[in-house]
């Protein structure tokens, strides 16, 4: 796989740190190439495939990335879309894009995950009774 064990551990640690701030659930899915013309459409398929829509607050966030063509998409569930302002993900996406275009894929994902945790904290603060509803492991397609 393109990501070393250390890379994957770094991503899992970033997800766990972000999820200490928010009840939002963050996942990363990586594929070699994007089978759809639009990475956002593929992200929607992956979101469903990973059962990310099954969180109690519908506040899952998927970071979708392809290695060959460096396409990526950020997708938040309905519960997030219902409460955040338009363009909520734009700053996160733009910050990631610079890293990804420079080939710093793990750095880009880590920065995106950190920002997602910070931004979601205002809308979905961490609750003491919160449980980890989705795996923190990176999934590969």
Question: What do these predicted ranges mean?
Answer:
Residues 1-60, 65-141:
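A structural boundary signal for the start of the first folded domain, especially the loop/turn
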């Amino acid at each position: 796989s393109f990501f070393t064990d250390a890379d994957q551990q770094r991503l899992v640690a970033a997800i766990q740190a972000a999820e200490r701030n928010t009840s939002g659930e963050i996942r990363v899915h990586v594929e070699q190439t994007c089978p759809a013309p639009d990475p956002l459409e593929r992200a929607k398929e992956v979101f469903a495939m990973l059962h990310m829509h099954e969180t109690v607050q519908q506040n899952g966030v998927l970071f979708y990335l392809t290695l060959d063509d460096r396409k990526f998409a950020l997708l938040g569930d309905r519960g997030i879309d219902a409460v955040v302002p338009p363009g909520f993900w734009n700053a996160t996406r733009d910050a990631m894009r610079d890293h990804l275009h420079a080939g710093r894929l793990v750095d880009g994902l880590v920065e995106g995950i950190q920002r997602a945790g910070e931004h979601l904290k205002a809308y979905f603060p961490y609750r003491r009774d919160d449980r980890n509803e989705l795996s923190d492991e990176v999934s590969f397609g």
